[in-house]
């Protein structure tokens, strides 16, 4: 097994082998985020689902009330007047067949791809390039739409798409270490509510199995997800 760096081992030694209350866990991760940059806060949720079955797949979006603290580069595949509309709304890239050809070459200087419905037949051919990166537009995720301005505004403000991976784990960034613990807790609570609200119809047995929070360069801390579920938003 690879050895922990001295820095990470030192930080990990501060964490007790127990489950922490949500706010306590967040505060501990913040205290351990000592890198020379503003570390991203991440949540890792293990769910009792088997995504190989279609009725146990989870893919949706969450609008974090305090944003992510990250700049999202958006590309839009559309045509006609919609190209100018997308650029005016803040998209870094917007175009029609030319943009599709650029993406097909593997040139993807963006974090999110939005498409209008009329362009999806062309975008669908990019599955080999977009699929592995999780960038294929999807109506459920709000990335296939005619309301480009609204979608761009929402994703720029902190709306995130997420899905459970093949092992049933959800990985979501929910802010920066520079956020207050209270702001991070609000974001984490909103994520929990979204996961519960979108529970797959085929999920059986215990839905939540574990929840860990961590930062980019820090150790992970296990969170009492039941305590998180019991929190009333705004309390």
Curated annotation (Swiss-Prot):
Gene3D superfamilies: 3.30.190.20, 3.40.50.790. The keyword Nucleus does not apply. PROSITE patterns: RIBOSOMAL_L1 (PS01199). One of its GO terms (cellular component) is large ribosomal subunit. SUPFAM superfamilies: Ribosomal protein L1 (SSF56808). It comes from the Bacteria. InterPro entries: Ribosom_uL1_bac-type, Ribosomal_uL1, Ribosomal_uL1-like, Ribosomal_uL1/biogenesis, Ribosomal_uL1_3-a/b-sand, Ribosomal_uL1_CS. Keywords: Repressor, Ribonucleoprotein, Ribosomal protein, RNA-binding, rRNA-binding, Translation regulation, tRNA-binding. One of its GO terms (biological process) is translation. The keyword tRNA-binding applies. Belongs to the universal ribosomal protein uL1 family. Binds directly to 23S rRNA. The L1 stalk is quite mobile in the ribosome, and is involved in E site tRNA release. Protein L1 is also a translational repressor protein, it controls the translation of the L11 operon by binding to its mRNA. This is Large ribosomal subunit protein uL1. The gene is rplA.
């Amino acid at each position: 097994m690879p050895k922990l760096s001295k820095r990470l081992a030192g930080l990990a030694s501060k964490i007790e082998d127990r489950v922490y209350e949500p706010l306590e866990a967040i505060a501990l991760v913040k205290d351990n985020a000592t890198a020379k940059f503003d570390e991203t806060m991440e949540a890792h949720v293990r769910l009792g689902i088997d995504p190989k079955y279609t009725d146990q797949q989870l893919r949706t979006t969450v609008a974090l009330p305090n944003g992510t603290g990250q700049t999202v580069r958006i590309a839009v595949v559309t045509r006609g007047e919609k190209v100018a509309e997308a650029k005016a709304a803040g998209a870094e890239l917007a175009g029609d067949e030319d943009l599709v050809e650029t993406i097909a070459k593997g040139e993807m200087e963006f974090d999110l791809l939005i498409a209008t419905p009329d362009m999806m037949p062309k975008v669908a051919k990019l599955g080999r390039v977009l699929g592995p990166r999780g960038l294929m537009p999807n109506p459920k995720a709000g990335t296939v739409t005619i309301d480009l301005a609204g979608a761009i505004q929402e994703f720029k403000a902190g709306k995130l798409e997420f899905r459970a991976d093949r092992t049933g784990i959800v990985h979501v960034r929910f802010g920066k270490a520079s956020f207050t613990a209270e702001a991070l807790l609000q974001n984490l609570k909103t994520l929990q509510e979204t996961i519960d609200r979108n529970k797959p119809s085929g999920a059986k047995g215990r839905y939540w199995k574990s929840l860990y929070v961590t930062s980019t360069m820090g150790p992970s801390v296990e969170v009492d997800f039941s305590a998180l579920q019991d929190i009333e938003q705004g309390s």
